[in-house]
Swiss-Prot record:
Listed transmembrane segments: 536-556
SUPFAM superfamilies: Chaperone J-domain, Thioredoxin-like
The keyword Signal is assigned to this record: yes
Residue intervals annotated with topology Extracellular: 557-782
PANTHER family given in the database record: DNAJ HOMOLOG SUBFAMILY C MEMBER 16
Record's function text: Plays an important role in regulating the size of autophagosomes during the formation process.
Record-given protein name: DnaJ homolog subfamily C member 16
Chain positions covered by the region annotation Disordered: 562-593
Domain Thioredoxin as annotated: residue spans: 119-247
Example of a GO cellular component annotation carried by this entry: endoplasmic reticulum membrane
UniProt topology in membrane: Single-pass type IV membrane protein
Broad class of where this protein is predominantly found: endoplasmic reticulum
Length: 782
């Protein structure tokens, strides 16, 4: 009896849930959700979707039901934006792909089967979160369909990178990476990274277009290019992947030596320049993303306040080094145009700051696009926008008329007036249209006030009768015109159609052709080996087979010829070995296995050119052994260094270099600060600053793991006696000569003695028993 009652209860529960699901499915009307009629056009549907999406987005609307409402809006737009799904919904009340009588018969079976699956496999009963809709509601608001990806994500990827996850139902690995994905999404979305999720089961066309043939897959999109993430799914790896998508030249490292050149580039680049002062040696990811979003409008630089030589900048611009400070410079490099300072800068604050300072105070019109932005078309009588245009000749330095025009613009900043200037020799048609009497203004500057009436180029304008010299009378006349214009817009009596501006900053034809060719080759490469590799496999197999047939015989013949030559020349090689054997130094049998085939040690100089390849990007497991020397000790130390390390050159993981102490003392002292047992680095204002002698120091640098081992030479008896004999020398004389002569009266023999124990140190290095000093990052080698 009890079993029968339990069975009836379960049946009643099943029927009740089934009825509720059917009613909820019938209540969903995409037209009502978007608030449009059944005859609405795609433009109306898209407009309504954008309006509702902005209103109900969970990040902006704190209503508890905002997320559910946003999901309904997205589903409604997905149905109505697809003509096939919309037609199916209008005819059968559902957005599926099947039609007609078969579709109507399958609807009841689908509802019951859907309920059956949810009942037996829902996580609320058995905790198996295989259904993606039940598994993670956070993915719902990031779901992409093909039209949304093509029309919105790809164009938007030219302003910000996108991180997209490909998932599916019954994906165990997808469940495994969910916690990491949630954490990364929450972090990167706040920084401005676009997020997307593609369900491979429902959006097969989009998944195939992206080249994702397995789940889970994570990829990045920037500038329309797709890059796959091929590393362990952890937070740090995903963050580095997004950072690697960005171009490397977005932010320039600014120091006390180059900040004047950086800020003075506004005239050539026609852009404001932004500087961020911060205490971290690495550029923040938020700042890089901002630089990518506004790369067409501003130039970005970064100042690490912990670097030597930045004190002058911090004093000059009154920077608080204990909090991040953002400055924007326009035409004047001595004083920033705007400043913000905050310990925790948010993306919205930075975006508002950058948007308010996107253009120079009196920007130069270099393209038609910039003309549209600075001088927009009038939308109504209340939204009039006037442009005051200075027509002047191009000069290498700022001319007096332009400086006067700039000072006038600074003193008369208004929302309805924008000040710009044009180089008459570069935009001759544009300037000729605004100057009715070109001969009267030949070689002189002129000022015109204009208002755009439509996008076709129609403008009304007024040109000042006399040339612009920048005098006080000229400023007074221009100010009178602007005051009169507020009361009587009919002052602009002349009318004309302006020609389109020539793009002055566009690359020349050959460069454009080269860039287009590179992009085309890159797209072809991606389409062959990335997106459509499965379809291209037969063709690739055919090509490689043909190449093997054509060149196989040639390669075999070449190897046979070389083997014949080797068989015919053993006596010559024996004679050569006897000759070289006389010149090579003798070594013990114990070290004979380490002796390379070369009869010399290859030692390269560590400079700013070889710094990246020989250290920063050194392969894992490889080390660079660097000798510190000066110009006066170079010959003697290199000879002794080569003799000491010769027996260790048989290892392919060791590289040998030398560093000039005269050129890169600051770099060396920065590294030695991380050595726990190293002597303290003196202050640069100390009178004994330049007396410290680092010649003979040897550093074993591991570029991949960012650590180094230190060899410090021990003073020999001869060296101590030589130094003692110099103690009576006048200290001022010693200071004057110490820069070029680090040791007084030391011959080459005591200098070579500094490296007498280097071979023992090298053996300990290979054993791994030396102390390691880790550093956060490799400093730049200036």
């Amino acid at each position: 009896m009890e079993v029968r009652k339990l069975s009836i209860s379960w049946q009643f529960l099943i029927v009740l849930v089934l009825i509720l699901q059917i009613l909820s499915a019938l209540d969903f009307d995409p037209y009502k959700v978007l608030g449009v009629s059944r005859t609405a056009s795609q433009a109306d549907i898209k407009k309504a979707y954008k309006k509702l999406a902005r209103e109900w987005h969970p990040d902006k609307n704190k209503d508890p039901g905002a997320e559910d409402k946003f999901i309904q809006i997205s589903k409604a737009y997905e149905i109505l934006s697809n003509e096939e799904k919309r037609s199916n919904y209008d005819q059968y009340g559902d957005a599926g792909e099947n039609q007609g009588y078969q579709k109507q018969q399958q609807q009841r079976e689908y509802r019951f089967r859907h309920f059956h699956e949810n009942f037996y496999f829902d996580e609320s009963f058995f905790h198996f979160p295989f259904n993606s809709e039940r598994r993670d509601s956070i993915d719902e608001k990031y779901l992409l369909h093909f039209s949304h990806y093509v029309n919105e994500v790809v164009p938007d990827s030219f302003k910000k990178p996108y991180l997209i996850k490909i998932t599916s139902d019954w994906c165990f690995s997808c469940i495994h990476i969910e916690p990491v994905w949630k954490e990364v999404v929450q972090e990167l979305e706040e920084l401005g990274v676009g997020i997307g999720v593609v369900h491979a089961g429902y959006e097969r066309r989009l998944a195939h277009h992206l080249g994702a043939h397995s789940t889970p897959s994570i990829l990045g999109i920037i500038n329309g290019k797709i890059s796959f993430f091929r590393n362990a799914v952890v937070r740090e790896n995903l963050r580095q992947f997004v950072e690697s998508l960005l171009p490397g030249n977005l932010v320039e490292k600014v120091t006390g030596k180059n900040y004047v050149r950086f800020l003075s580039g506004w005239q050539q680049e026609n852009k404001p320049h932004v500087l961020l002062f911060d205490q971290t040696p690495i550029v923040p990811l938020l700042y890089k993303l901002t630089a990518f979003a506004y790369k067409d409008y501003l130039s970005f630089g970064y100042v690490y306040v912990g670097l030597r030589g930045t004190e002058e900048m911090t004093r000059r611009y009154n920077i608080n080094i204990y909090a991040p400070t953002l400055l924007v410079f326009k035409e004047h490099i001595n004083k920033p145009a705007d400043v913000i300072q905050a310990r925790g800068m948010k993306k919205q604050i930075i975006d508002d700051f950058i948007t308010q300072n996107k253009h120079l105070l009196a920007a130069r019109l270099t393209s038609q696009k910039l003309f549209h932005e600075l001088c927009p078309v009038r939308r109504s009588h209340r939204q009039r926008k006037y442009c005051v245009v200075l027509l002047t000749a191009e000069t290498t330095k700022l001319s007096k008329p332009f400086e006067a025009f700039l000072s006038f613009a600074l003193a008369n900043t208004q929302d309805t007036v924008r000040f710009v200037h044009v180089y008459s020799n570069r935009q001759q048609e544009f300037a000729g249209t605004l100057l009715p009497d070109g001969e009267a203004f030949q070689g002189k500057s002129a000022v015109s006030i204009l208002e755009r009436r439509n996008t076709a180029g129609r403008v009304v304008y007024k040109t000042l009768e006399d040339p612009w010299t920048g005098s006080e009378s000229d400023k007074f006349i221009l100010l009178g015109y602007l005051d009169q214009l507020r009361k009587d817009p009919a002052l602009l009596s002349s009318e004309a159609v302006l020609p389109d501006l020539t793009d002055e900053l566009a690359p020349v034809f050959l460069l454009r052709w080269f860039y287009s060719a590179c992009d085309y080759i890159s797209d072809c490469w991606d389409s062959i080996f990335h997106n459509n590799w499965r379809e291209m496999m037969p063709l690739l197999s055919l090509i490689f087979s043909a190449l093997f047939i054509l060149f196989g015989t040639v390669i075999v013949q070449a190897f046979s010829d070389s083997s014949d030559e080797r068989e015919s020349s053993p006596p010559d090689k024996e004679e050569a070995q006897e000759k070289t054997g006389k010149t090579e130094p003798s070594f013990t049998k114990e070290n004979s296995s380490k002796i390379p085939k070369k009869g010399f040690v290859e030692v390269t100089e560590l400079t700013d050119v070889t710094y990246t390849s020989n250290l920063v990007r050194l392969r894992p497991g490889h080390m660079n052994v660097v000798l510190i020397l000066s110009n006066s000790t170079k010959t003697s130390l290199l000879q002794k260094f080569a003799l000491e390390v010769y027996t260790f050159t048989g290892s392919s993981c060791l590289h040998f270099s030398f560093l000039s102490l005269d050129k890169h003392r600051e770099w060396l002292e920065y590294l030695l600060e991380f050595a726990q047992d190293a002597a303290p680095i003196p202050n640069q204002y100390d009178k004994h600053f330049m007396e410290r002698d680092y010649t003979g120091y040897v550093l074993a640098l591991n570029g991949h793991k960012k650590y180094f081992c230190l060899f410090k030479p021990q003073k020999t008896v001869e060296e101590e006696e030589a130094i003692g004999s110099c103690s009576d020398v006048d200290s001022s004389l010693y200071l004057g000569e110490s820069r070029g002569k680090p040791s007084c009266g030391l011959g080459s023999r005591p200098i070579k003695g500094k490296l007498s124990k280097l071979s023992l140190w090298m053996e300990r290095l290979l054993e791994g028993s030396l102390q390691r000093f880790y550093i956060p990052s490799w400093p730049e080698l200036d």
